[in-house]
């Protein structure tokens, strides 16, 4: 993993270009950063091979034509190399996706804080009303308006295979992603 990080840094350096003089076509248009599609980079279980100095990668990736995904099970693994580096990586990643969560502390705090609060209304009480058809509860005519957390730890822990909470800017999307679960073959050739 650490060798891959070193190679990626070298690729990003090369994407800056070698010449600073010449025609626009020679200096700017020939750079790999002019591609219509970014170079996709997925760093799965990043925390286990994190190295100091990696925090600049997501900060510079977009301008160099790279799309970087830092994936892991928990935030403390990202912090093994450096807490400051982990915080910088989190801050420079625009989209945050939380699938099934098992760390109710540090990792949950990150997603809870990122999701923020929303103004919600709720009925303050109900009344028992009886009539010709029997009795039933009817909401009172008063409501309470307050800021509440947009996600809670149970939401994240109870997610099934492929389910996720996706945070982008101020948007929170509860979604279902592709989950490959092919049947096991009877025979293998």
Segments predicted by a language model, with ranges:
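Conserved P-loop NTPase motor cores
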Residues: 1-139, 172-174, 178-188
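Intrinsically disordered, low-complexity acidic Ser/Thr-rich regulatory segments
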Residues: 28-35, 137-159
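P-loop NTPase catalytic cores that bind/hydrolyze ATP
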Residues: 150-185
């Amino acid at each position: 993993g650490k060798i891959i990080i070193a190679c990626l840094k070298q690729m990003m350096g090369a994407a800056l270009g070698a010449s600073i003089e010449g025609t626009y076509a020679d200096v700017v248009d020939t750079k790999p950063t002019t591609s219509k599609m970014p170079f996709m980079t997925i760093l799965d279980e990043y925390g286990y091979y994190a190295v100091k100095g990696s925090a600049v990668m997501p900060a510079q990736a977009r301008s160099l034509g790279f799309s970087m995904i830092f994936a892991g099970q928990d935030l403390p693994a990202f912090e093994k190399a450096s807490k400051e580096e982990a915080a910088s990586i989190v801050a420079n990643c625009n989209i945050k996706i939380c699938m099934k969560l098992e760390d109710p502390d540090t990792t949950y705090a990150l997603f809870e804080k990122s999701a923020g609060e929303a103004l919600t209304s709720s009925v303050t009480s109900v009344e028992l009303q009886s009539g010709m058809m029997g009795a039933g509860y009817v909401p009172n005519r008063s409501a309470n308006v307050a800021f509440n957390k947009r996600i809670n730890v149970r939401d994240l822990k109870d997610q099934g295979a492929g389910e996720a909470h996706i945070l982008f800017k101020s948007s929170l999307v509860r979604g279902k992603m592709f989950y490959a679960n092919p049947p096991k073959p009877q025979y293998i050739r």
